[in-house]
């Protein structure tokens, strides 16, 4: 998401997005961050949030806020110096480490094994446990929008990013074994958005034209589904997201319409692989490994579904500067949830029959909202001393997957 400076709008939201499993909405603003639970958005009339003012740390105007699932570990990119990545533990109120780069950070993705940092022309990979750099992918095709995604399932860390500035190719890189996996042609135009499903065996893609959304199997790059939006005009696709069971895919754009596509198999349609692979026998081995975890619709790589219209749509009350959309599973029901940069979140119940979805919840979020803080952690003046004291009193457990210990180290 593009940032808006505080001079343009003192109360603006600079960043908004969902965490890896869509259980938390992350908001970055001029003074700090706010986290909202999606379950609270669906269940409560009044929202609470976890948040903190980070100005005492010099982190004014948070441009990127990413949280590791529902843990206390998060990363911050501040407008004070967008070339610096701050890894922060918000329970102990301690900066774990800083990593400085020679260009602005455009995108950050986390899973339980890796932190992946995307610059305009290179990608850095860090080990989450000790925050040490594992690898850097140099001289990547110019990626001014920071288009990149990382799988979130345990033990798997595939990175996807555009493979060309001229065509719509997608490159997959294994961030565990630190080696290239495959490259496949997804669109004629350049890639504008891409997103893995939660199992890491499918990826959705959209080009800068925005009229066609496709789904490919991972890692071999077979086209599984192709969806055409309901209008012919070009749009900017802001976000893509699979449901947790990979039965639905949703997209948002610079229009007021959110589209939901149903991932159903169609019998008797042949499809050819679109991947050019690297690694020979190694690729065959990893392909078999991934196949063991693929759902049935992914294994049927010969079956391609093409639809001219979305399965369901949701109308946003207005077109914001930007938005992010997700499919949230709550109490055996699927919901479409859209969070906008003008400080609103909208929830729609996904009807199994599709069609136009009804708005069931609407909340204000961000610094201008009337929400209350659930667990105040802001320190104000003297916050650094309190942070050190808090981290000494309660050291997080290294073996707890939802917690990681504060460590001190800075990379140049």
UniProtKB/Swiss-Prot annotation:
One of the GO BP terms on file: autophagy
WD repeats: 100-139, 142-183, 186-226, 232-271
Locus of motif L/FRRG motif: 227-230
Listed GO CC annotations: cytoplasm; cytosol; phagocytic vesicle; phagocytic vesicle membrane; phagophore assembly site membrane
Pfam families for the chain: PROPPIN
Tagged with keyword Repeat: yes
Domain notes: The L/FRRG motif is required for recruitment to phosphatidylinositols including phosphatidylinositol 3-phosphate (PtdIns(3)P), phosphatidylinositol 4-phosphate (PtdIns(4)P), phosphatidylinositol 5-phosphate (PtdIns(5)P), and phosphatidylinositol 3,5-bisphosphate (PtdIns(3,5)P2).
Name of the protein described by the UniProt record: Autophagy-related protein 18
